[in-house]
């Protein structure tokens, strides 16, 4: 019973990932997702969101615009392994040792350790993430200034991540995975030719 009007040609050539509202890391780690699944408001709760693309090869870049950072030591952005979830309610990717993050207090978190890394960041800052899965390295930027290579030897499939590990602190952000460099109108579009930008 199919006719021509029941069919739709799909030729995906310019796809962008978003935050995945159903791929929260564990129970009680959900916030409120809006703006085409690019904005996350954590509602003063623990959050851990992965993006919809798993990355195992190639070079990738995305940016996170910081809206609210309640407690710098617990607000993080970076990557974590795909196909891993918390073993209990509230168990996040940092607890599981499956994340590489640049923390708002300037520290880094990598599987098995933490330490000093770069400048602190706050509300109004943009954190860029440059991931080279061919070389297995990740480098972060604060407002276009490199913070240096943070880690190497990354051989797992990973996905972009934002997480906040203090139930009493707010962490709200908007992502740009290439589709909207205005961060839902929070900034002036950078004119990169993304859909809805110019």
Kindly label every feature range from the protein language model.
Residues 1-198:
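PRY/SPRY (B30.2) beta-sandwich protein-interaction domains
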């Amino acid at each position: 019973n199919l006719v021509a009007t029941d069919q739709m040609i799909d030729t995906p050539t310019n796809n962008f990932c978003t935050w995945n509202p159903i791929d929260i890391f564990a129970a009680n780690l959900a916030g409120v997702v809006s703006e085409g699944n690019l904005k996350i408001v954590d509602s003063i709760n623990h959050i851990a969101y992965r993006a919809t693309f798993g990355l195992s090869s190639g070079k990738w870049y995305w940016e996170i615009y910081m809206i609210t950072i309640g407690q710098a030591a617990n607000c993080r952005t970076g990557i974590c392994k795909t196909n891993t979830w918390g073993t209990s309610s509230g168990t996040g990717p940092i607890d599981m040792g499956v994340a590489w993050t640049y923390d708002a207090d300037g520290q880094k978190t990598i599987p098995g350790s933490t330490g000093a890394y770069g400048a602190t960041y706050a509300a109004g800052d943009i954190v860029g993430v440059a991931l080279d899965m061919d070389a297995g390295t990740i480098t972060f930027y604060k407002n276009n200034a490199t913070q240096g290579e943070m880690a190497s030897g990354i051989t797992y499939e990973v996905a972009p991540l934002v997480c906040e590990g203090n139930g009493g602190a707010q962490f709200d952000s908007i992502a740009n995975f290439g589709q909207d460099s205005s961060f839902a109108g929070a900034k002036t579009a950078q004119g990169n030719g993304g859909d809805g930008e110019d």
